[in-house]
Each structure stands twice: as structure tokens, then as C-alpha cells.
């Protein structure tokens, strides 16, 4: 499925609270906390963490979770949108390890080191978070922008074909210009493992003066060409530049992500 959009939003399938028969309290903005940094044995560095929690949490209820990368730049934007759209979702923000020129971010968002970053998220970060907070482990989203948007695409392809760790994927103007031939081959390799690819995947392209739209379109095309079953692939394109496209599109992205 492909959509070209300039703005707007659609109804959300996650909350809002007034859609639940059991709600007794009106929606309240979520709680935002800075957590201690977590160290990784897979990547050898530590990552500062943030978390957003639904304010009126209900006992014995679990909530969808979004693992959002680049949290030092994107966390507040996404959390603000969750509040605006009255969504009961847990948001885990993973900040970057800061080195010169953010080289760690660049290297670990690309193949093959993306495998180690994915191992950190799925085997170290998520167990740490999900033993402390009421996460619905069958409704996980991974979200990234630029280089980490590329990483989101790689996660889609490297995840377990039978029991994927993530069920939803959001890539904002991903840097799919990096190793294009390899990425195309990874799509083909994943298709060879099986036709089923269980995900709702949203690809956002920025077609302003500065943006990765040409390469986001390529990745969308490769996925369409592979003809995966169970892949709900949504392409959204905006007349925006590379950085502003996240804030411009996030409302539509989140409501599309959780629509029925």
C-alpha cells in the first residue's frame, strides 16, 4: 500500500481513552522520566534512556510500546503527539552514544554492525524495560530517523521470520542511500526465507530540497517487488526537508500506525 500525503491525520486504533468501556478517568498527559543509562555488551557503550508512561495506568493492563531511537532529538516530539492524540502507549527513548561526529550512530545503523545494535535492543534493553513496565510484548514498534531510519528497515529484514520481535516499524526519511545494493540483496534474502513478513511498516519520505526521498522510494519498491504476505506497507511523502519532516508527519504517522 502506498500513500502520498501533505498532512492531516486518520483515526487511531489505540486508545483514545473515551473509546474504552472501562475508562473511569479522562485522558491526562503522560509521565516523562529520564532513566539511568544502560550499558551494552554487544556494542560496548552506554545509552541514556527516557520513558513516557500513560498517566492513568490500569492494574493488570499492558500497553503497546514504541522504542524510539535518537531520543535526544525526537523523544519530546513523539511524546507531545501521543498526548495530543490521547494515546495510551509506552514510549522508550534511546539516546545515542556521543562520539566525534556521531560515528557510532552511523556505523551501528548500517550493516553489519546493525546486527549488534539490534541484539542490544532486543536482548538487553527490552528485557530491562519490560520487566519493570507493563508492556504488551505482542505490540512493539521500532522507530528511527535518517541513519536510524535505515536501521529500522534493516530490523524489518533481520528479525525472526516466524516470531518477529517487532510488529510495527516506522522509518522517517531513512538513509537508504547507504549500501543500496546490499539492502536490496537483504530484501531478496529475507524473501527467500519465506513469504510472510508480519509487520505494519510506515516509510516516510521528505521531498524537500534536502531529503532522502529517492532512496526511501527505492526501499518501498524493493519491499513491494518482494510481494511479502502479511506486510502492511504504508508510504507517506511530504513536501518537507529531512529534519522537519519528523515533527510535520508524526501525528499522521502515529494515528496510521495504530488504526484498525
Map each language-model feature to its residues:
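Primarily recognizes the serine-hydrolase "nucleophile elbow" in alpha/beta-hydrolase
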Residues: 138-187
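A domain-start/cap signature at the N-terminus of enzymes
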Residues: 6, 10-63
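Short, conserved loop/helix-junction motifs that constitute active-site signature segments
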Residues: 83-86, 164, 190-198
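Sec-dependent bacterial lipoprotein signal peptides
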Residues: 1-4
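C-terminal catalytic histidine-bearing segment of alpha/beta-hydrolase fold enzymes
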Residues: 209-260
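Serine-hydrolase catalytic machinery in alpha/beta-hydrolase-like enzymes
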Residues: 62-134
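Short beta-strand/loop motif that positions the catalytic acidic residue
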Residues: 203-206
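Solvent-exposed loop/turn segments at secondary-structure junctions
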Residues: 71-75, 96-100, 147-150, 175-178, ...
Amino acid at each position: 500500500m502506498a500513500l502520498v500525503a501533505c498532512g492531516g491525520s486518520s483515526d487511531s486504533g489505540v486508545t483514545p481513552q473515551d473509546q474504552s468501556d472501562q475508562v473511569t478517568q479522562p485522558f491526562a498527559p503522560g509521565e516523562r522520566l529520564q532513566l539511568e543509562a544502560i550499558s551494552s555488551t554487544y556494542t560496548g557503550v552506554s545509552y541514556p534512556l527516557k520513558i513516557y508512561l500513560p498517566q492513568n495506568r490500569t492494574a493488570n493492563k499492558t500497553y503497546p510500546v514504541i522504542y524510539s531511537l535518537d531520543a535526544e532529538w525526537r523523544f519530546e516530539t513523539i511524546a507531545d503527539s501521543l498526548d495530543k492524540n490521547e494515546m495510551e502507549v509506552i514510549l522508550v527513548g534511546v539516546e545515542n552514544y556521543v562520539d566525534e561526529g556521531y560515528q557510532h550512530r552511523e556505523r551501528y545503523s548500517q550493516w553489519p554492525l546493525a546486527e549488534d545494535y539490534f541484539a542490544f535492543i532486543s536482548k538487553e534493553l527490552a528485557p530491562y524495560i519490560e520487566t519493570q513496565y507493563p508492556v504488551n510484548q505482542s505490540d512493539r514498534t521500532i522507530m528511527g530517523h535518517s541513519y536510524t531510519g535505515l536501521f529500522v528497515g534493516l530490523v524489518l529484514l533481520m528479525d525472526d521470520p516466524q516470531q518477529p520481535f517487532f510488529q510495527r516499524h516506522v522509518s522517517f526519511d531513512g538513509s537508504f542511500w547507504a549500501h543500496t545494493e546490499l539492502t536490496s540483496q537483504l530484501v531478496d534474502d529475507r524473501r527467500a526465507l519465506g513469504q510472510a513478513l508480519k509487520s505494519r511498516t510506515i516509510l516516510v519520505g521528505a521531498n524537500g530540497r534536502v531529503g532522502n526521498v529517492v532512496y526511501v522510494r527505492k526501499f518501498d519498491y524493493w519491499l513491494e517487488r518482494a510481494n511479502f504476505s502479511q506486510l502492511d506497507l504504508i508510504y507517506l511523502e511530504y513536501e518537507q526537508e529531512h529534519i522537519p519532516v519528523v515533527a510535520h508527519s508524526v501525528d499522521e504517522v502515529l494515528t496510521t500506525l495504530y488504526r484498525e
